[in-house]
């Protein structure tokens, strides 16, 4: 950066605490790049340091924190604001270059060469000396993940464009996908969030572009597209496929031109392709305004196998260094910078802070569906198909029992048929070969049983509708209320209880209004909601008052009849014995 910019930055007040990570493991000091010159330190263990100290020394700052216990993400708003809201940059249009991809594929390693270029872009030897360790973003050899969440370099570079304007350049490092501690949702969230906030997303791949790489890209970009409210154009800007360890230079040469030819072949939509493969390629073309590809050779055996490798150029193959000198300026040279745009409008540093806040809230909420692995998605589809088939079998069989053209069936017979057919449907579900295991499939069997019970409840209502007495229950109930109120009104009026008589007349009038309204609703089909309310009131009166009263009266009549029969029988026996004695 220019000296004036550094002086202005040094004068900015910075308060509060930031998270940074410092290497405490002595053995890691060999693999990690230690602090040198202008590129700051490597950090590993979570520490809190004063932001004044952090701003005095360039270093990576974690702005999106990954919580492994609940697989959620948190934005460190204070850290992001203190980086992007510095007075000399906050109103500048921003360029965000992000590197994403699978874990342990050298994303942070690549970003550190980008840092070298940004600090020495005016020099032909920006790539550094042969014995100079690689510093900047934390990186190391090995098979365990290093970066979590999203980190940015805390020094925002102010660059003069060829057209005379100034832009701010921010470098972003992301958590590697598909490690042993991250879910598909974690990977999708990090990739989508970095793609949504970057102007250039470098998709870091190893050796080749495989079909699963494209499918994961489709899933992750769709997850990001869903989070953006209204999209009338391609939602994302530039995607650069970076193929590391390219082993086929005899087919496609290293660099941009070879990558362009290779990418065109990989993303070509062919008529004889399966529809699934065509859709993946169409989706990628529809999501990004610009697509590119760069083929990078293997850095050499010393880089891959030497545990003490610290990024010195003397240990890296010449082919790799040559192509690296072409790649980094392709992304970061002033004439090649891509300014961040959202919905066609340029984004400033100040704007990007607000977009980060808005996007992280979306991913912290439950509005978006949770992305799933291919196995889980296939197992779900497999089980749902089995549920649908078994439910369809149950419905068709029940239609034969009490369908629209079938007569009314006794409730006890209907329930017996239901239980038999439910068992048949469950057996059919179990007989289908399904993915996911017994515990996973059990949830879908429970879902099937619940759906069958819900369908059975509808069949009960349909069957009850065929019962003429059930259909006449509402008018009969209302008429019974009117008749009872008429009798009670007459009796209470006769004995002088006029207030009760008036109340009974009022209830009788309401019942008459309900009866007339119900008849109109059934005749015209209008005001069906009112008709439903009247049916519910009548149902409540029937179940809570009239039916219990009728049952009690019937029990009393039956009891009286039995008593009279017993008495009559005893009387007959006594009379018979008396006649025998007389004879």
UniProtKB/Swiss-Prot annotation:
Gene Ontology cellular component annotations, sorted alphabetically: endoplasmic reticulum; endoplasmic reticulum membrane; endoplasmic reticulum tubular network membrane; membrane
Binding residue positions for Mg(2+): 108
Linker, as annotated region: 466-474
Effect caused by changing residue 556 to K: Increased GTPase-dependent fusogenic activity
InterPro entries: G_GB1_RHD3_dom, Guanylate-bd/ATL_C, Guanylate-bd_C_sf, Guanylate-bd_N, P-loop_NTPase
Domain description: The GB1/RHD3-type G domain mediates GTP-binding and hydrolysis as well as homodimerization.
Protein name per Swiss-Prot or TrEMBL: Atlastin-2
Lineage: Eukaryota, Metazoa, Chordata, Craniata, Vertebrata
Gene that this polypeptide is encoded by: ATL2
């Amino acid at each position: 950066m220019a000296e004036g910019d550094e002086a202005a930055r040094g004068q900015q007040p910075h308060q509060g605490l930031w998270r940074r990570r410092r290497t405490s493991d002595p053995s890691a000091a060999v693999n990690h790049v230690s602090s040198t010159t202008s590129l700051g330190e490597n950090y590993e263990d979570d520490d809190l340091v004063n932001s004044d100290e952090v701003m005095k020394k360039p270093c990576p700052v974690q702005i999106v924190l990954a919580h492994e216990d609940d697989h959620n993400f948190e934005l460190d708003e204070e850290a992001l604001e203190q980086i992007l809201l510095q007075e000399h940059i906050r109103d500048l249009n921003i360029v965000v270059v992000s590197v994403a991809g699978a874990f342990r594929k050298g994303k942070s390693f690549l970003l550190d060469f980008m840092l070298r270029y940004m600090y020495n872009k005016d020099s032909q030897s920006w790539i550094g000396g042969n014995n100079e360790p690689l510093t900047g973003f934390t990186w190391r050899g090995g098979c365990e993940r290093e970066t979590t969440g999203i980190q940015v370099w805390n020094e925002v570079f102010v660059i003069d464009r060829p057209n005379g304007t100034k832009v701010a350049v921010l470098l972003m490092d992301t958590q590697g996908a598909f490690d042993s501690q991250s879910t598909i949702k974690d990977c999708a969230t990090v990739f989508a969030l970095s793609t949504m906030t970057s102007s250039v997303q470098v998709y870091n791949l190893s050796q080749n572009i495989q079909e699963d790489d494209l499918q994961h890209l489709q899933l992750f970009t769709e997850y990001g597209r869903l989070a953006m409210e209204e999209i009338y154009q391609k939602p994302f800007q530039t995607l650069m496929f970076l193929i590391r360890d390219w082993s086929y230079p005899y087919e496609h040469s290293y660099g941009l031109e070879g990558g362009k030819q290779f990418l065109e072949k990989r993303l070509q939509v062919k008529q004889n392709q399966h529809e699934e493969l065509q859709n993946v390629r169409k989706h990628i073309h529809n999501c990004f305004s610009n697509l590119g590809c760069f083929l990078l050779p293997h850095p050499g055996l010393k880089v891959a196998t030497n545990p003490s490798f610290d990024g010195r150029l003397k240990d890296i193959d010449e082919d790799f260094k040559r192509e690296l000198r072409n790649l980094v300026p392709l992304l970061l040279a002033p004439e090649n910078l891509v300014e961040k745009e959202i919905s066609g409008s340029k984004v400033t540093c100040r704007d990007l802070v607000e977009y980060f806040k808005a996007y992280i809230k979306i991913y912290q909420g439950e509005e978006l569906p949770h992305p799933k692995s291919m196995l889980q998605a296939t197992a779900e589809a497999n089980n749902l198909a089995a549920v649908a088939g078994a439910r369809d079998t149950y419905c068709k069989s029940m239609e034969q029992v009490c369908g629209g053209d079938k007569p009314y069936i006794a409730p006890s017979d209907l329930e017996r048929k239901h239980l038999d057919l439910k068992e048949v449907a469950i057996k059919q579900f179990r007989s289908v070969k399904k993915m996911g295991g017994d515990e996973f499939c059990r949830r879908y069997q429970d879902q099937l049983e619940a759906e069958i019970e819900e369908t059975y409840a509808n069949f009960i209502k349909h069957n009850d509708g065929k019962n003429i007495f059930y259909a006449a229950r509402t008018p009969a109930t209302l008429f019974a209320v009117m008749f009872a109120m008429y009798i009670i009104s007459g009796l209470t009026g006769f004995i002088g209880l006029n207030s009760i008589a008036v109340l009974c007349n009022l209830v009788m009038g309401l019942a008459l209004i309900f009866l007339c309204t119900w008849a109109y609703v059934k005749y015209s089909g209008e005001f069906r909601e009112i008709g439903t309310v009247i049916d519910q009131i009548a149902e409540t009166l029937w179940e809570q008052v009239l039916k219990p009263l009728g049952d009690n009266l019937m029990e009393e009549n039956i009891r009286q009849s039995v008593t009279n029969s017993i008495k009559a029988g005893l009387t007959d026996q006594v009379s018979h014995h008396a006649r025998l004695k007389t004879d």
